[in-house]
Amino acid sequence: MAKQSMKAREVKRVALADKYFAKRAELKAIISDVNATDEDRWNAVLKLQTLPRDSSPSRQRNRCRQTGRPHAFLRKFGLSRIKVREAAMRGEIPGLKKASW
C-alpha cells in the first residue's frame, strides 16, 4: 500500500493540472507561434516557468485504485498487475481468464 500522503499528492497534482490547463495551453500556443515576436514568445516562456511545477500533466503518475501502487499499472483496469491477478483468480473480471497453451 502506498502512503496516504503519496495518494493525496497525486490528487493535488490532478487538481492543479485541471486548474491551470487553459493558461498553460494559451502560453504554449504563444511560444509555438512563429508569427509572434521574439519578445512575446520569451515573455510567455517566463510566465510558463512561474506556474506551479505540479500543474504540468507530465508530473502525474497512474496509480492503482485499490493500493496506490505506481508501478505495473494496467490502464484497462485501473489496477496494478497484482490486484488484476487477484481479481481474475476470484472471477471478478468478466471475460478474463488465465492463459493456457
From Swiss-Prot:
Keyword Hydrolase: no
GO biological process assignments: translation
GO molecular function, one term: structural constituent of ribosome
Domain of life: Bacteria
SUPFAM superfamilies reported for this sequence: Glucocorticoid receptor-like (DNA-binding domain) (SSF57716)
Statement: the UniProt record of this protein carries the keyword RNA-binding: yes
Disulfide bonds: none
Alphabetical keyword list: Ribonucleoprotein, Ribosomal protein, RNA-binding, rRNA-binding
Gene Ontology terms: cellular component: cytoplasm; small ribosomal subunit
The protein's role, per its UniProt record: Binds 16S rRNA, required for the assembly of 30S particles and may also be responsible for determining the conformation of the 16S rRNA at the A site.
Summary of subunit composition and partner proteins: Part of the 30S ribosomal subunit. Contacts proteins S3 and S10.
Family, as annotated: Belongs to the universal ribosomal protein uS14 family.
Name of protein: Small ribosomal subunit protein uS14
Lineage: Bacteria, Pseudomonadati, Pseudomonadota, Gammaproteobacteria, Enterobacterales
